[in-house]
């Protein structure tokens, strides 16, 4: 028997978390390049540690970009503006080591080159998309609230409501399910970096009143809901001084918070010829449209590619038993409605734009911003027609 009553937990981290600082630096560099050269090939990795940021990778572009300036601007916007934090946009060292993309890879993803003349996938690999009916955004409830909590922490820090907060923070939300439906929030964990002089009581009260109660709806909390705020008691040393940060270390935060599967490829710092990013966005677009069309309540889509080959080697749909029609027929509809070749994905989702910095904190999915084209539900009518519902 499948487990129907359970508690499921997801976490999020704020824009000031060291791994997220690295993601945002990588995507800020990608955006700066795409703004000048939309066809650039970018694979940019970032490391941040006490007093230092390192960027390295393979970039082939005609764009002229002041990389250290982009790095510093990003760190400043996040809020590391004081060397007392161990990381400061003005004084940190910035090291740059950039090479060009390998010509062996380039010929596989450049139209008219390689064994297959069409633009092929930038690498082999498997990517997943997911959607469900738990929230209006068609995302799992636990990750939705976890992201909203870390966003709210950043907001009250920047607007001065809780001026003792510093940029590094994390949240975790545990949701109780009864008969496979989310019914209440069981536990909320928040850890936020803060100034040395503030009392624990002020931190706890401020975060509960100005963050938790403003985000988690009252009907989802009860007297049994636990709130664990800075449970170590002190969090002064944080950010890149507390932990070394690296691009691509928060792939579950970036996607579905542990719901569904993950192919293992990170998103940030990669231009859309890399299917790790573009096909994962397409997977979300497909899954969300299938759920929005009413074909299923939960949907996981897997696509897989071979390097240099345009057509996916496989497409799989799993509705966890919630499908109105067979998963086999849904997979056929996916191939009929959506073009899953890399160039077509880039065109359908308009991915050659400098839109990626926004994706690099608070989740790539479930945020209905105008730039997030993969969140549109504009294929619902066509899907319903083909499904005959």
Curated annotation (Swiss-Prot):
Signal peptide: none
GO biological process, one term: S-adenosylmethionine biosynthetic process
Ligand binding (L-methionine): 58, 101, 243, 274
Stretches the record annotates as Flexible loop: 101-111
Source taxon at top rank: Bacteria
Primary residence: cytoplasm
Binding sites annotated in the UniProt record for Mg(2+): 19
SUPFAM superfamilies attached to this UniProt entry: S-adenosylmethionine synthetase (SSF55973)
CDD domains tied to this protein: S-AdoMet_synt
GO cellular component, one term: cytoplasm
A molecular function (GO) term: magnesium ion binding
Chain positions recorded as K(+) binding sites: 45
Obligatory cofactor(s): Mg(2+); K(+)
PROSITE patterns tied to this protein: ADOMET_SYNTHASE_1, ADOMET_SYNTHASE_2
EC number: 2.5.1.6
Keyword Nucleotide-binding: yes
Keywords: ATP-binding, Cytoplasm, Magnesium, Metal-binding, Nucleotide-binding, One-carbon metabolism, Potassium, Transferase
Subunit structure: Homotetramer; dimer of dimers.
Function of the protein: Catalyzes the formation of S-adenosylmethionine (AdoMet) from methionine and ATP. The overall synthetic reaction is composed of two sequential steps, AdoMet formation and the subsequent tripolyphosphate hydrolysis which occurs prior to release of AdoMet from the enzyme.
Protein known as: S-adenosylmethionine synthase
Gene: metK
